[in-house]
Amino acid sequence: MSRVCELTGAKANNGMAVSHSHIRTKKLQQVNLQKRRLWWEEGKKWVNIKISTKALKSIQKVGLDKFAKSNGVDLQKF
């Protein structure tokens, strides 16, 4: 199972962990993914989808259908 948001395509970011003595080591910052069952009003069905919490906030603001269309995602495949 890949750690990629199915709506936005957000994935892990490579960063550095910096200690108090300024020793830098590589660190992977993962996306906060959640499995959600969302109601798709236009399709009149439930959609099981793995999305980031940032995408979930956007869906609550503008709606699932509008957000999916703006990101070029077809909800029929879910």
Curated annotation (Swiss-Prot):
Keywords: Ribonucleoprotein, Ribosomal protein. GO terms for biological process: translation. The keyword Ribonucleoprotein applies. One of its GO terms (molecular function) is structural constituent of ribosome. One of its GO terms (cellular component) is ribosome. NCBIfam families: L28. Belongs to the bacterial ribosomal protein bL28 family. This is Large ribosomal subunit protein bL28. It comes from Prochlorococcus marinus (strain MIT 9215).
